[in-house]
Design a protein with these regions (language model features):
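Divalent metal-dependent phosphate-bond-processing catalytic cores, especially two-metal-ion Mg2+/Mn2+ enzymes
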Residues: 2-36, 47-74, 85, 110-113, ...
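His-Asp-centered metal-binding catalytic motifs of divalent-metal-dependent phosphohydrolases/nucleases
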Residues: 76-104, 108, 118-128
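Alpha-helix N-cap/N′ positions at the starts of helices
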Residues: 40, 99-100, 153
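Short, basic/glycine-rich phosphate-binding loops at helix/coil junctions
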Residues: 38-44
Length: 215
């Protein structure tokens, strides 16, 4: 598999020089996930986020929601792995540009993850909107072509129906909590308001296939 090379900031290069977990081909928690594997994704999460952290709880909740969706629709393990790893760009070892979708996809690419996975992580939940706000939309599209609409929509659905603490919520509740957390002038709040109509349509369409999330 070809490996992308790109300049790293000094701080990021230093962080990545510290030995860390590998998703493919090296032991993690006593396992060696040599292919796309939701169990390996969960093991990586547990190494990169502190126990009890909101980001860990949210990622686990999104992963479990994806497992439910995959059972109903017959979706592949790729969806579940991407769901567990979708916010890995918030981990200290991965943070670089501030666009967590791009940072997470780059980090996973460096671990040898396949482009099918990195593309989902890179583009989940209307990433191109925030990327444009940050001047990173060109880099995002060049490095990670947008993946299949079906899996990307399902991943985004799982994210938008899971709270910051990993609980199942409605899309109304999800937006309400996002806007409570970020003031109107914040980049995240602005990006989500721009993306909100599309995200609501996406969630509504998938809920017609699945039914509303469990409460």
């Amino acid at each position: 598999m070809q490996t992308r090379t790109r300049p790293l900031t000094t701080s990021l290069a230093a962080r990545r020089a510290v030995p860390g977990p590998a998703l493919y081909g090296e032991p993690m928690h006593g396992t060696t996930p040599r292919k796309l594997d939701p169990a390996g994704a969960q093991a990586l999460l547990s190494q990169l986020f502190e126990p009890g952290a909101d980001r860990l709880a949210h990622s686990i909740g999104v992963g479990r929601r994806a497992e439910e969706v995959a059972r109903v629709l017959g979706s592949p393990d790729l969806l579940v792995s991407a769901a567990y790893l979708h916010d890995i760009g918030y981990a200290a070892v991965a943070r670089d540009t501030g666009l967590h979708q791009l940072d997470g996809a780059r980090y996973l690419s460096g671990l040898g993850a396949p482009p099918e996975l990195t593309g989902l992580v890179a583009h989940h939940t209307e990433a191109t909107v925030e990327a444009a706000e940050r001047g990173l939309d060109g880099a995002l599209r060049r490095e990670f072509p947008e993946p299949s609409d079906e899996l990307l929509d399902l991943l985004t659905y799982c994210d938008m129906t899971t709270s910051a603490r990993g609980e199942a919520v409605t899309v109304d509740e999800r937006f309400e909590r996002i806007y409570d957390r970020y003031p109107p002038s914040h980049l995240v709040s602005r990006s989500m308001r721009e993306a909100e109509p599309r995200l609501r349509r996406l969630v509504s369409g998938i809920e017609r296939r699945l039914g509303p999330p469990p409460r």
